[in-house]
Amino acid sequence: MRTWTDVIGSEKEQDYFKATLATVRSEREAGKVIYPPATEVFNAFKLTELDQVKVVILGQDPYHGPNQAHGLCFSVLPGVRTPPSLVNIYKEMQRDLPDFVTPNHGFLESWAQQGVLLLNTVLTVQAGMAHSHAHLGWETFTDRVIEQINASCQGVVFLLWGAHAQKKGRFIDRSRHHVLSAPHPSPLSAHRGFIGCGHFSETNRLLSQQGMSPINWHSVCG
């Protein structure tokens, strides 16, 4: 089976992706502050190898404040205040999962280590400017990533929150995989159906039904 190194390596041969990476590099060299740091842009793939993927959570673009983004969607580094969307994710987990205690941090690496690919659809952003890298080619790259998961894996649970993530649903074969959709957890839309969606318990029910080990969502509580 291919690895993420294979997938990313073959995309780096494509003209569109060469242009994406060159633009990001030249912005950094020109002194613009770009998040996450260059060494962490592909963090999601380092922590969750292709043959380990059981769940995919799709975000949009990285957090654009200092010390927040580290390459995993919705996650922030330890010691950084939990952002509002993640506060709502925790709120739904507390409602959905017995004994879930809201953590005092937003560091989600322990989910990634269990097979939850925490993927933004755009992997870089300029400081203080949301969506500033939305049209650099990252979307094409993450389309390829989803196509690869669709083709290589079986029984993956995709959590698609908000219209942006749901658009990516067109690449997913629903006879091989599971798709759970809800409004985005941001404060603007969480109360339109994200709170109450039950996606975390439902993900584990679907994994268990296929003989796969469930995700210990509580791993962030410890």
Curated annotation (Swiss-Prot):
Coiled coil: none annotated. It comes from Aeromonas salmonicida (strain A449). Its EC number is 3.2.2.27. Excises uracil residues from the DNA which can arise as a result of misincorporation of dUMP residues by DNA polymerase or due to deamination of cytosine. GO terms for biological process: base-excision repair, AP site formation via deaminated base removal. HAMAP family: UDG. Its main location: cytoplasm. This is Uracil-DNA glycosylase. Belongs to the uracil-DNA glycosylase (UDG) superfamily. UNG family. The keyword DNA repair applies. GO terms for cellular component: cytoplasm. The gene is ung. It is found in: Cytoplasm.
